[in-house]
C-alpha cells in the first residue's frame, strides 16, 4: 500500500477508504479490540488524511500562483535598470557615480564585472561547484535595485520626465518586488508545513494511516 509520490499519497488515502468500506461491510462481525482499528477511529483518521491531502493541494496551488506573479513582477526589472543607467549617464553625476551605476546595472543584468576566462575549466562539483556567474536570486535583485534607488536619490540632476523613472515610481516598483518575493516565501513555508502535516497523518510510525492499514 505505501507510496510517497504526490499521486501516491492520494492513492494511499483512497486505498484506506476501500479498507474501511470492506470493514463496514462486515457489519457486527468486524469488532476489533484495538481502539485504533475500530470504525470510528478509522473514519476519523480517514477524514484527517483527506483534509491534509486537500490542504497540500491548496497550498501548492497558492505557491504556484504567487511564484508566477513574482516572475511577472520582476520581468520589467532589467529593461528598467537599463533606462535608469542611460538617464544617469546624461546627468551631471560624477564619473565615479556613473561607474557605480554601471556596477549595479551589471548585477541586475546578471553580468560579471570582468569576463570569464574560458580557457580555464570550471571547478568540478566535487571541489564545491565554484561561484555563481550571476546574482540572480530574487533577494539579490531586490537589494541591488534598492541600491540603484539610493544612488539616483543622491544625484541632484536626476529629474527624469518619464514617470516610471522617478524616485517615487522606482520605490513603488521596488516595494512591489519585495511584496511579490515575500508572498512566495510565505507560500513556500505554508506548502512545506502542509506536506509535513500530511506526512505525519499518513506515515507516522504505528499511528499513521499506512501503518494502521497494515495492522
Task: Locate predicted features.
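Basic/polar low-complexity intrinsically disordered segments
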Residues: 1-215
Amino acid at each position: 500500500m505505501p507510496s510517497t509520490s504526490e499521486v501516491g499519497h492520494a492513492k494511499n488515502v483512497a486505498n484506506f477508504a476501500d479498507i474501511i468500506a470492506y470493514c463496514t461491510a462486515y457489519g457486527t462481525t468486524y469488532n476489533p479490540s484495538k481502539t485504533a482499528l475500530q470504525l470510528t477511529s478509522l473514519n476519523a483518521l480517514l477524514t484527517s488524511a483527506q483534509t491534509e491531502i486537500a490542504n497540500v493541494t491548496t497550498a501548492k496551488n497558492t505557491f504556484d500562483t504567487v511564484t508566477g506573479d513574482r516572475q511577472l513582477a520582476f520581468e520589467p526589472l532589467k529593461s528598467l535598470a537599463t533606462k535608469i543607467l542611460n538617464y544617469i549617464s546624461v546627468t551631471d553625476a560624477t564619473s565615479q557615480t556613473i561607474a557605480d551605476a554601471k556596477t549595479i546595472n551589471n548585477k541586475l543584468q546578471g553580468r560579471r564585472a570582468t569576463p570569464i576566462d574560458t580557457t580555464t575549466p570550471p571547478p568540478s562539483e566535487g571541489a564545491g561547484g565554484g561561484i555563481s556567474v550571476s546574482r540572480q536570486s530574487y533577494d539579490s535583485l531586490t537589494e541591488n535595485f534598492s541600491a540603484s534607488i539610493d544612488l539616483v536619490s543622491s544625484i541632484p540632476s536626476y529629474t527624469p520626465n518619464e514617470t516610471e523613472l522617478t524616485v517615487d515610481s522606482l520605490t513603488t516598483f521596488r516595494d512591489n518586488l519585495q511584496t511579490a518575493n515575500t508572498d512566495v516565501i510565505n507560500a513556500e513555508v505554508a506548502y512545506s508545513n502542509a506536506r509535513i502535516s500530511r506526512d505525519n497523518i499518513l506515515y507516522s510510525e504505528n499511528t499513521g494511516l499506512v501503518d494502521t492499514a497494515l495492522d
